[in-house]
């Protein structure tokens, strides 16, 4: 059910295209072309919004109890119609100025109406399709307005008096701008910025900047003359055509607060370290940041390690663990199940790591991963062979091969599988005397004579005779790679160290450290080299720190320094600076 409803109209005026006319042929700037305003009848389309009322059905509740019933509702709908109306508008057209006419497709109005039908010297000039006046004998000119100079024709006649006729005195000689009279004739000239037409009398406006006039950037017209100009940041060179860059930084053209960097056609302001450039790109403002460490509170929600990051805390786990789905909780990573374990035969997983084992008839190899077959005869002999323990050395008796054996060392014999022998056995062992001791040659030392003074770490110096390392107070071990202060805070001397990558009673357990660094003989904790830190020595020192555990602060002048060595804190200076802290500027060359 619908019913019409009179509503309102939103009208938008849209002008139709102008019909083609003389304005498309004659343009402003053409010779003798004038602008005219005229009224033109145009048709316009006017959109209007119409409204009507529509009645729709819908289901509603509450008719009688919980039942539904049909209801009716009136809604207003709209549609758009277009109506055509006619109106008068002012339009600009270009026509020939009064007294002038355009012929065919001439670029302007070059013919004067005043000359049509004009009588000169009793002769009528007829303007036909040839657009040339047919002059009678004895007359000349575009409108036959000049009489031929009989005096010039008879100049060779003896005694004849010559008299010049000024053709420019009559209608300016037919010239549009300037008429130049000469002896016996004349010619037309044009003002600056114009050129003569093919008829030698009409002047056409020229563009002096046509072809850019050789200007590198811009060509501008002033009083009919071309003049070169440059973009901002450039200036004209001596030839008045090329453009060269203006160094704003050399003078006072660049109002930079701190530093100025020149560029082609412009410049850029920069600030001292610790400042930032303002919105005006000229002034500098000190940077004041409030550093909030999100990891200080509740370790950032991380189970193990927390590092501040953009957007919040970044959690990481100890070796042998992995992040749970919440990105914060660390759970055990089963290397045996994942296949990342290096075990050749048996793998035993434990919290945070794993160990390799071998089947019966095999023994673990020196790399802690593989399994070597036991020789049956050696296996029987090992049941009867005791273990001879030297200080820092464990080997079967006799200890073969050794680089050099020297009698004099007191040692004890004990069973390898029973570190806690009973007192009676100890009494018997105490009475035994070893017949050999290990002596390394050629400046080597260590359990298997594989170390030298080049392996001394953490500031350790070579002992006299190159028989070991002299360690600073806070370090110990064969090569000064173990801290003398344990995690409990008590000053204790740690046992002698193992080779890089191993720890444990027999130096057979693998360290889980990055970069193949030493680890604690007993605990397996990573002992970082200079310039590295972190639980696994996997992190390089942050900028501005160096030394053991990155605990020392670089003393370099930051704004003059390219790099501070993470190992020893030495400064690498930027170009133009010198000194142990890059604190001195190099003198300018004379």
UniProtKB/Swiss-Prot annotation:
User: From what superkingdom does this record's organism come?
Assistant: Eukaryota
The record lists the organism as Mus musculus
Which spans does this entry mark as compositional bias, Acidic residues?
413-424
**Is Iron given among the entry's keywords?**
no
Question: Signal sequence: where?
Answer: 1-23
Listed as disulfide-bonded, the cysteine pairs are: 109-125, 135-144, 168-179, 175-188, 190-203, 209-219, 215-228, 230-243, 249-260, 256-269, 271-284, 449-462, 456-469, 471-480
What is the name listed in the Swiss-Prot or TrEMBL entry for this protein? EGF-like and EMI domain-containing protein 1
UniProt entry keywords in alphabetical sequence: Calcium, Disulfide bond, EGF-like domain, Repeat, Signal
Q: Where is this region: Disordered?
A: 393-424
Question: Could you tell me one molecular function GO term of this UniProt entry?
Answer: calcium ion binding
The protein's matches in Gene3D superfamilies, at most eight in alphabetical order, are given as: Laminin, Tie2 ligand-binding domain superfamily
All copies of the EMI domain together span: 44-104
